[in-house]
Amino acid sequence: MALKNFNPITPSLRELVQVDKTNLWKGRPLKSLTKGMSKTGGRNQQGRITSWHRGGGHKKLYRVIDFKRKKIDIFAVVERIEYDPNRTAFIALIKYDDGEYSYILAPQKLSIGDRVISSQAADIKIGNCLPLKSIPIGTTLHNVEMKVGKGGQIARSAGTSVELVGKDSGYAQIKLRSGEFRLVPLDCKATIGSISNPDQKNINLGKAGRNRWLGWRPHVRGVAMNPIDHPHGGGEGKTSGGRHPVTPWGFSTKGKKTRKNKRTSKFIVKKRK
């Protein structure tokens, strides 16, 4: 996919850069593989804000994605490549030889008419899903499981992938884009190839309103608030906040480590850069 630039006939078009989606499916998604979504506005069941700067946005249907690739040893044909408003990657509608339809994450270079399969021992081909023990070292992967049978969790965003760098003592060692090296059980599944839409990182929304369409509200700085609302608030005139950057609850921010799950730290061979 290429990038689209626009003639600056309005100020918001001057900086706008979008991904060219002319080759994607133009119709509606498959109805049997969609669900309705209700908006939370960033609120939990008590009505309190748990995720700031969320709200509004265009109504969306959720596409049910098969992250587990649970149909084993049955070939499927790629019917079409579609846009999914719920994620940055594109998705592929596949039809199995027994007639069942399914959505999967579309890897780069997957084309309409390609045949893919999920198997214990399949060809090392774009879109095929295999256990890590059956994949040769050096292969580029996406949608990698962290627990056997749970479904892919690693490398699902646009343009992402991991590299299989080693196997030892029942675990595979994978290298993430962040530079982290992590151990994953050899029986976990992964799909061959990199995720589609690598140009997603180069887009420019062009105007604030386009962010509102995506469900994001304005991000207000702490120094622009009153003292009751933020530790950086208040002061006469424009101030710098008067202290090291903190969250609205007074905890240090900008680089402070927040990961607390020491139980699974043993699976991280090398921390991210």
From Swiss-Prot:
Cysteine pairs bridged by disulfides in the record: none
Region feature Disordered, mapped onto this chain: 228-273
GO cellular component, one term: large ribosomal subunit
Listed SMART domains: Ribosomal_L2 (SM01383), Ribosomal_L2_C (SM01382)
Key word Cell membrane present: no
Keywords per UniProt: Ribonucleoprotein, Ribosomal protein, RNA-binding, rRNA-binding
Superkingdom, taxonomy of origin: Bacteria
InterPro entries: NA-bd_OB-fold, Rib_uL2_dom2, Ribosomal_uL2, Ribosomal_uL2_bac/org-type, Ribosomal_uL2_C, Ribosomal_uL2_CS, Ribosomal_uL2_dom3, Ribosomal_uL2_RNA-bd_dom
Entry's Gene Ontology BP terms: translation
Pfam families registered for this protein in UniProt: Ribosomal_L2, Ribosomal_L2_C
Biased composition (Basic residues): 254-273
GO molecular function ontology, one term from the record: structural constituent of ribosome
Gene3D superfamilies, sorted: 2.30.30.30, Nucleic acid-binding proteins (2.40.50.140), Ribosomal protein L2, domain 3 (4.10.950.10)
Family: Belongs to the universal ribosomal protein uL2 family.
HAMAP family: Ribosomal_uL2_B (MF_01320_B)
Assembly notes: Part of the 50S ribosomal subunit. Forms a bridge to the 30S subunit in the 70S ribosome.
Primary role: One of the primary rRNA binding proteins. Required for association of the 30S and 50S subunits to form the 70S ribosome, for tRNA binding and peptide bond formation. It has been suggested to have peptidyltransferase activity; this is somewhat controversial. Makes several contacts with the 16S rRNA in the 70S ribosome.
Name of the molecule in the record: Large ribosomal subunit protein uL2
Source species of the chain: Rickettsia typhi (strain ATCC VR-144 / Wilmington)
Gene responsible for this protein: rplB
